[in-house]
Amino acid sequence: MNKALILFILIILAFSSCKKDEETAIVDKSEMEKGIYPDIILENAEYHIGENGSDPILLKAGKITFYSKDGYALTEDMTFSSQDERKDIVFSGSAGKGSINTDGSNMSLWGGVVFKDEKRGMEIRAENLELDRDEDTIVADGRVMVESEEGRFSGYDFKGDMKTGVYIFSEIEEGELNFE
């Protein structure tokens, strides 16, 4: 009788010690409501994304949650970089969270985004940023700060073309040009 009681208590303890950590999991809550769950969740992971013919992106993140059927991944505490065929860094950066198109390499980033265009020596800081690798464009809504050798600017609704090096604000709040 005592063995059965001990076994019952051990089973209860085992099940009560397991919990689902919904607060720290980066899972698309709207997808979970539809019954769509991630394929895999990686912690402290490195992952390469990119198509043939484009410079792949090395992604390092505290967590990466993959939804391979839908072709995207959610990230948390991430850094990223891309190198060209000569192994020169094209761009790099960091963000608190992101949504990555794993079929291509487009990224939606938010939470203290820092994006560095290494070839042009420019750093962009924004709360959110969209990187479209197909068009080689950057879009950041809201307040954005840009710093380079040419100067420092802050403004709103930033758009950039990485092919041509043309970067514009819809409204400049303040700026400083260096004429050297």
Predicted regions: what they are:
Residues 1-180:
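Mature-chain termini and adjacent capping regions
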